[in-house]
């Protein structure tokens, strides 16, 4: 006899089962993230309908076997392992009474620092899914997934997600430990590994993965302002930059780290060698900022010069100016454009061309998510910087396949590894690398904090606290949001709500206040209310998108504003 239990949440943890039996026998527990629906192998299913799907666990065929005795009641709680699962399959060889079945979540016991609520249920679910995937993978190390025969600390995942993670939890101690592991794992030639802690089955010096050693320490400083950790890793960061310099050929060859992964799992093809060069430029960009924080002026000049040298190489080798002039979307992938824009690798007169090309590409792809590991963490901010905040909203809230919300529509309770981990048309992905609990694509939550709420805390900048929410237009199904971030200065809170109806001039018919009224009777407008809380003793630069509101510095306290939204 077999019973399959849906716990309702994909979690990393252990099972606890209370049972009683009047006979000796065996109770077997088997785990799965999904269930087989039809038993059709053509849909990637590995068992009969209703059984747990196990193929994506690969060789980690996690199973618990309990020898039952003739006794009234017994509780089994695993103590020797944990795994990722939502479904628990319980098979017995003798009659048994199950009185309690529980999945006990295991994760990092670190205080949550971020919160977010909104009136879009699917976006809210995506936010909760991200928090769950972070909890499930941030335990002893920052693992990629909690279920299969891997569970490694892939650096590429952290390179794109670490900024988001720092909004969600107080992770200073966690990342301090990670930084020590990083230094321990660094190769003698200066290359950073693909995984931290390092395992002999993985490589090193690969673009987009090794670069976590440059970016993560700086991101930690952004949020905590503690130079000690940054200073402790600085010589290691320099060693990696020296490694890149030694292996780079600026005279017509390749520059940067190894082009092994490219834009991993991206549906739009990117040139992996080009991305390696862009990552090298990004590293120089970040090292310049790091050196400035540590007041190493000679190094600031050194990395400024290197950044310019890389920019010149990229322009020459990849014909950047010529390709931008053609304004053909297929000349650059979205990820390539995002990296050029975010790491200041474009000449000033080319920035707008690249931004327009990015906006056109996203629109042409009908707001589907086509970026991979590298680009997904950059796309929303890049669109917003390009004046395309509404495009960013449409991309984030798209339910087309592939998209962030497609998995939510399929009942996901965590973030999926692949855009096609499961589809209604084809079933499960045929690729065995198919986790349903991977935090990397949850990097969109950074944009929720920084743009929807408008909270930015950057202790490396001139203004540590900025509050500048970006509100959606009438095409976006979102009219209310609120949230907070508990920074080292205290808790910062932002809430906004767009009124259902507010008409500047009296009209004779009912109108949608989020659209223009062309009847001649008057103009319809949207009015919004904002509530902002700034920690006591601190000052925040506040910019609100309401008519007549000039950006201003406000002291600690609770502030309320209302007004007509800018068009």
Regions found by a protein language model. Give the residues of each.
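Extracellular/oxidizing-compartment recognition motifs
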Residues: 1-148, 156-157, 173-174, 194-198, ...
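Non-catalytic C-terminal accessory modules of carbohydrate-active enzymes
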Residues: 39, 390-567
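Flexible glycine/proline-enriched surface loops and loop-helix/loop-strand junctions
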Residues: 72, 141-148, 158-159, 265, ...
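Active-site acid/base region of carbohydrate-active enzymes
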Residues: 87, 95-129, 135, 142-194, ...
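Core register positions within helices of long alpha-helical scaffolds
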Residues: 216-219, 283-286, 290, 343, ...
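TPR repeat positional signature
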Residues: 217, 277, 284, 336-337, ...
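Hydrophobic, well-ordered secondary-structure elements that form the walls
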Residues: 226, 280, 340, 379, ...
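Extracellular polysaccharide-recognition and catalytic grooves
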Residues: 328-433
